[in-house]
Amino acid sequence: HSMRYLSIIGTAICCVMLVMTSVSCKQETLSSTTQEKKVAPWYVYIDGSSFKDIEPVKEIISSISVFGNPPKSFIDECHQNHIEVYQAVGGNEETVDTPQKRKALVEKYVSDCNANGYDGIDLDLEHLSPDIQDAYTEFLKLASKELHAVGKKLSHCVSFYPALYQDNETKMFHDPAVLNTTCDLVRVMCYDMYFAPGIDKPELKHRDDCMGIGPTSNYLWTREAMLFWMKHIPNDKLVMALPAYANDYAVTGGIKGRQIYQSVPDSINGILPSPTWLCYEKVNMYLYDGCLLYTSDAADD
């Protein structure tokens, strides 16, 4: 990930809020006596972090995927509140390109889960070469087998790059059919439709999400992302990941972009907008140089 922080209470807690698609498609009534937990955020554990960060929203959180190294006491407290905890891990092509590396890595996953009490591993490997697909398939099969053997789960973050919108047969580094048979959860990252920090990076010019200026996401693109993955993964395994940040561009001179993780002052009176829990409604803001013109193509409702 490029770091995606969402400030829920005071300090930065979550990178992205996640909603089960199988829940979002249901008709729910206010009279329902059973409230199903629906939110599964990524959580960045840093110095000063504690379960107190999560306390205000613990009743709606089903699981968290943790970047960093929380103490076992933190994981235990999550379990006491019926929250599953995944260890978020990254990597690249060289991480899994030989049988020896794959075996050692999976052994480490199992060891970390058993030692710290994690409920599973959340794989966040992104933008790998499609040429690695065969090796990655073997990696997924091994990770799934060994984690499930000790009662742990396997989660995977997936994207919907613009190329998939144009060609559903685009080869990826992970085979969707293999993800379906090996993973317990598949988290669809409905963001980085445009990756603002990559707009001026020559080494990223080949990436679809760095070809031009645009929003982090929008509703129609998110819908297409979910529809694509629903063709490959059952709804009860899918998680819809929504961005808690916006793209910010300076477009005079050399174009540069960045990601912003908090509300910006009104350009006229300098006052921050009222806090809102609906962070997704503000994901499409832009900055046009010094004039501070912010726009959004998100729907009002």
Q: Which residues does each predicted region cover?
A:
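Glycan-binding loop/region signatures in secreted carbohydrate-active enzymes
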Residues: 237-296
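Gly/Pro-rich active-site loop or hairpin
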Residues: 198-227, 283, 288-296
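Bacterial N-terminal signal peptides
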Residues: 11-21
